[in-house]
Every structure is written in C-alpha cells, then in structure tokens.
Curated annotation (Swiss-Prot):
The gene is fmt. This is Methionyl-tRNA formyltransferase. Pfam families: Formyl_trans_C, Formyl_trans_N. It comes from Paraburkholderia phymatum (strain DSM 17167 / CIP 108236 / LMG 21445 / STM815). InterPro entries: Fmt, Formyl_trans_C, Formyl_trans_C_sf, Formyl_transf_N, Formyl_transf_N_sf, Formyl_transferase-like_C_sf, GART_AS, Met-tRNA-FMT_C. HAMAP family: Formyl_trans (MF_00182). GO terms for molecular function: methionyl-tRNA formyltransferase activity.
Amino acid sequence: MSHTLRVIFAGTPEFAAAALAAIHEAGFPVPLVLTQPDRPAGRGMKLQASPVKRYAQEHGIEVAQPPSLRRNGKYPAQATAAIEQLRATPHDVMVVAAYGLLLPQEVLDIAPHGCINIHASLLPRWRGAAPIHRAIEAGDAETGITLMQMDAGLDTGAMISEVRTAIAGTDTTATLHDRLAEAGAKLIVDALVELERSGKLASIPQPAAGATYAEKIAKHEAALDWRRPAAELARQVRAFDPFPGGAATLDGAVLKLWSAAAVDASCKAEPGTIVEVSPEGVVVACGDGALRITQLQKPGGKRLPVRDFLAGSTLAAGQRFELAQPQ
C-alpha cells in the first residue's frame, strides 16, 4: 500500500532503525533521513555508520548527518546548511526517534504537522536519554512507548498515544529494547495512517505529577556496591545488559557480571564476600540478602555461564569483591 504523507525521519540507533523500516515498508515516502555523524567503534575504532544510516543507504534514501541543528551552537555553518536542507525538502511531518541531537524551535516549526517523537517510556515517567535502563533499574512493573508532539522541552510534549508492556523479572535492557522498538514501530505507523486520513492527531498535555528523568548511563555506574540489597543489584545487572554491564573487582581484576538473581539468605559474611561457589552459581553476600551470579566475563574474555567460567578461572568461598566507591 502506498501513502502520500511525506515523512522526514531523524534517528540514530537500532531502536530508531526499526521505526524507519516500518514507515518505509508501510509505503510512506521518506525524502530525507537525519542521523548522527559516523562514529569510531569496535576494536579497530573505525568509523561506523549508524543503523539508521545503513538502512537509508540500503534503500536509496537521502541521508544528512549534521553534527548540530543549533545555529548558535558549536557548528553554526553545518546547522544552517541542515536547516536549509530541511526547508528545501518537501515533507508533511517529521518523525524523531532516539536521534541524539537537540531540535530547536526553528526546526520543530518546519514541517506542517510538526515533529512526532517515539519515546521508550510511559511519559512523564523517565523523560531523557536512558528510559529503558532506568525503568528496569528502578524495579518498575511496566513501561511502554509514548508518541508525543515535540516541543522545545526535554520530552515534555503533548502525548498522542501510548502502548504498555510488562517488565518481566528476566528482562534485560536488550530484551526490553527489542520489544519496545517493535511496539514503537507499529505505533508510529498507525499514527501516520491516522494523520494522513484525518489531517490531525489528537493529543493531551503531559501531567505535571509523576515526571522523572532518566539520566544517561555513565560507565562508573557499572560497579556493584555490595552494601546495597541483593534485589537492587540484580536489577542493576539486568538494566546494564548490554551496556555497560555489571562490574565487580576481585584481586585487581574487573569481572563483568551479565546474569544474576537475588536469593533469600541470611548472610553473616561481609558484603562482597563469596559465600558459595558451584556450577549453578557464585553466591555473594550483599547488604541485604545475597546475589547468585550465573554468567560472568573475565577481562579480555567472553560471556560465559558460571559452569564454563569456573573451568578456566578459580573462585572460592571466602574471597571478597572490592566495595565500589561512591561517585
């Protein structure tokens, strides 16, 4: 099925690429895609295109990669050129998903139907850069996707629609990301179909109550503080998979922890002390309860189930992980 509503798309990672693919495959014309500049990545630190750029190039869609869209920012010439390109490209609406650049009011006003953002939380909870991680870390029972009409604030625009999903006790950021990316892709296509049909999308202002901010994940947050309750540390491990992973230092070596669960245990050992080692898991005393680690990675190694990890590394009851220093 082909459509007439012309969509400029702005996004960068896999989450955004899923939405772009759905919009394009639904038959909406996409005359231009904006995505962040190529970045060094991988062991060789070679420049790599974003998932959104790769999809656009594979399907013959024009791509622009301005480092900024703010005329008064660090890259005024590139921002001005990109804004002029937007003005010169006939389109009806702009869709934004995990783009990573601030859109000034001047840009928000270009498209006749404005800019629609696909945000991976139930707004106003978890506005900001890392809503999926923070929802798991906080122990939220559910999260979802919100479509909003963008304004100049940070994820403060009026809400168009939402879809909810439960957060399972086994969900990681990776699994929840994929589920939300699929849900967001469907939701935006449905919204674009309605916008084309009726010429408008109803929206309601975000409530003032319940707003929280999802800070970007910092590498130092990976370190587990064993003085905290085991249930919180288990959520931290799930929230930080695939990045940056849970980290624990033993005898100067930093181990990555990729899978762990809280266990009910009245441990008298000091927090961080290994109290049990078996092929089923490494149990570590916490401030409250204990954490059973079932997947680990040593420096330079691969993620391994604990049984395989123990075949090449020695862990013993009585050893103690270092206590993370507060940042």
